[in-house]
């Protein structure tokens, strides 16, 4: 079962998520060649308007002080199960880790490492033997796998072992069919047994809606369904042009449980620019309020939690 076109004859994406077929096959970012957005991880996809191929599935800066925490650690001792983000230094800024099943967001401008952050977040789960789903609205499946390989992360092997699904979706088609995709994605999360999920980037989805109220309601409904599915989810978002501390449309920071801000910071002498991360909020967790420098290296993001920016 599952042969032929993975999305059935009525693929609403016109082949844009896979490598073939429909009139809009040049759409934004499907897989190259085989047309299987899950990297081979699929069962029999029933042809039809309400099944999108998710069905029947059988993831030395200047020395500074240690992170400052605002509250008594005992205040946050509870039965909440927590997990690390998977980024060196950043995890040390979060006391005990983020609560599992949280909805997280990372906000940043171009070149701040949002996709690297997301891949590293997912890699943490995969290397721990868990499963993950990566949904990209702006790249192909192959480019995501290539980027992970360049960082030394075994995403292709995880996909071959049916522990990782990388799905490339055209943002226009996603916006047009969001309620159906939302329902099928929730089913995929459950049947795939995903522990973590990434949506890169929610900004492209937001851009598909012209009316602010429609944009808010659609994004809210989508993120709420992810929250209710029980998977720990990370959304990437472009920063506002006006301030690095807000997302482009000012929505995701209010819908998510945790917000990480990535930005370029320029020194007072204007001669040096550094990358800096700040934890804007984490519900049910104590965390550092300091802004800390980080680098994007050939092995991922490293945060210097013991250092000052300049």
Regions found by a protein language model. Name each.
Residues 171, 190-192, 265-310:
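Conserved P-loop NTPase
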Residues 106:
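Hydrophobic anchor at the beta1->P-loop junction of P-loop NTPases
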Residues 109:
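P-loop (Walker A) phosphate-binding loop of NTP-binding proteins
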Residues 169-227, 293:
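Phosphate-binding/switch loop-helix module in NTP-utilizing enzymes
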Residues 1-89, 310:
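Haloarchaeal acidic low-complexity proteome signature biased toward cell-envelope/secretome components but also
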Residues 87-97:
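Pre-Walker A adenine-sensing motif
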